[in-house]
């Protein structure tokens, strides 16, 4: 292919600005905002979007997947157990059986977030990176959206006002920090919300409590993944991720039920 490439600077800049403006105009009022593009957040996004729910995922870093990429201590594999393996199979992720452990599978720690993120995007979810949620919209004792800022502006310590995204529901899938529910508790002490944080590692207990702890913790605000265990003082579990995927799916199902009943 020897054809001349077109590279006009003005056209490039105009294209970026117009497409970005159009995107933001479409995203300032959505059904669900998911804060944190880790395993549970991406899973929730996939199931919500494929059911026609207008979903945007906000991630402070420039990549999605949370801690999945690093596997276990940098070794490039994660473990997932039945029945969560079906969630990964739906996304076309290859799983290897663990000899002597019929309930366990290993998966490539790069393939998993890559394909799960693509599955969420293909389902219709929008993932925005480099965006941090610094506060919540709180109206009449209900979370009604998020207050957002550029992560680079926050890191630079610049005093620049944020903008907002309105939503029917917000999901805190920010992992161990549970930053969304912690922000709600810190800024609105009259609500009496306490976030005890997660306990030390007990994989079996941690995994089995994740779906149970996945729920609406304040009107309009759900927790899933490690944020759910942090809110309920559950145990951590290490590089086994089945509970995370099941938690994300359950969170999506809970919101779908709410939307259907409205």
From Swiss-Prot:
Binding site for glycine: 236
Binding site for NAD(+): 40, 59-60, 67, 133, 159-161, 179, 226
Record's keyword annotation contains NAD: yes
Cited Pfam families: Thi4
Keywords noted in UniProt: Iron, Metal-binding, NAD, Thiamine biosynthesis, Transferase
Reaction(s) the record says it catalyses: hydrogen sulfide + glycine + NAD(+) = ADP-5-ethyl-4-methylthiazole-2-carboxylate + nicotinamide + 3 H2O + H(+)
A single GO molecular function term of this UniProt record: pentosyltransferase activity
Stated role: Involved in the biosynthesis of the thiazole moiety of thiamine. Catalyzes the conversion of NAD and glycine to adenosine diphosphate 5-(2-hydroxyethyl)-4-methylthiazole-2-carboxylate (ADT), an adenylated thiazole intermediate, using free sulfide as a source of sulfur.
Full protein name: Thiamine thiazole synthase
Organism: Methanococcus maripaludis (strain DSM 14266 / JCM 13030 / NBRC 101832 / S2 / LL)
